[in-house]
């Protein structure tokens, strides 16, 4: 119980929140093979079922508890753990993400994750969470060792997309439990749900979705088809993901000041700075 700032869900600022959760990590043979193939000794992410909690956690779209989002006198210099309420994801995905795509896109482009079993959805979302955090700890600047610089607005947007696109490519390559479903989660949740958050102009995850849409559109991986609806080219998404990750990791090798400047320039190439009187 304490003053917490939620990542999503419409509650702005710090509110007193509380929750009860039960941790569960998938442990069957396919998942053990995944953990062995992508070993993550620094893993501090915990997959869980939200059992009960305050309205901000039970009713909104927020599925994560970050201890660094607690109002406290000092900001942690590293992330100690993160708790994810993945049992909430199915309802969010089926009531927001899929309908959002179906309103504007070709329905046949979203197949593997449509109407999936609740247990499969939970385990697939755990896979996304594991791979996402695995890639946070790869590359020139491991997230846990550079949390101060990587949680700023522009560097953070690029970091989130980098690790999601790396996860997407791994899932598309095969051998990952529920890989096709996870790939759709990543692509459609980022592009369809997050930009529609109520506070989208101030929401970090919304920024990642808008940046991804702009990047994929430039790459020809997503666009308006001859039917007048959006369509995606999954092979082009894979190729764009590889380029994006390479661009980001090249900039991560720069000194801090140059890295921060280059991160802003890269984001502003796709999301221009607002003019007078415009929202961010």
Where do the model's predicted regions map?
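Conserved helix-loop functional segments at active or binding sites
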Residues: 136, 140-144, 169-176
